[in-house]
């Protein structure tokens, strides 16, 4: 049995917010980028990998997480996910089984801005 065949709505226990970058002009006329919430959805959240490495005289960390949610056509790789106080960069978006029923998003914790 494929993993997406066994998926059911009861597995979607975590609230995840989908963020979109917007650009406004501040009072001095300079562009200001900010992330605004587009939607909040229920999702299954599964940590899948993590590692630490030494770069630029500091310890860096990578934490990858799999988010599975109901299919949405409006999610793009230039968006972010917010879950449990952390923002995640979208690394991959997969339509599980190609049936537009479940969406799997691979995300990586953003450690700087």
Go through each PLM region and give its residues:
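Short, conserved turn/kink motifs that form compact alpha/beta structural patches or helix kinks used as
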Residues: 1-4, 9-10, 25, 30-113
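Short structural boundary motif marking the start of a folded domain
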Residues: 10-16
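Short acidic, Pro/Gly- and aromatic-enriched capping/linker segments at domain boundaries
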Residues: 20-21
């Amino acid at each position: 049995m494929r993993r997406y065949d066994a998926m059911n709505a009861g597995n979607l226990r975590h609230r995840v917010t989908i963020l979109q970058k917007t650009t406004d002009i501040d009072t001095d006329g300079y562009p200001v980028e900010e992330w605004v919430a587009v939607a909040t959805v229920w999702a299954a959240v599964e940590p899948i990998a993590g590692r630490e490495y030494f770069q630029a005289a500091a310890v860096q960390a990578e934490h990858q997480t799999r988010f599975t949610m109901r299919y949405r056509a409006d999610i793009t790789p230039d968006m972010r996910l917010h879950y449990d106080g952390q923002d995640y960069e979208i690394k991959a978006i997969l339509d599980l089984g190609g049936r537009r029923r479940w969406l799997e998003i691979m995300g990586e914790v953003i450690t700087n801005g």
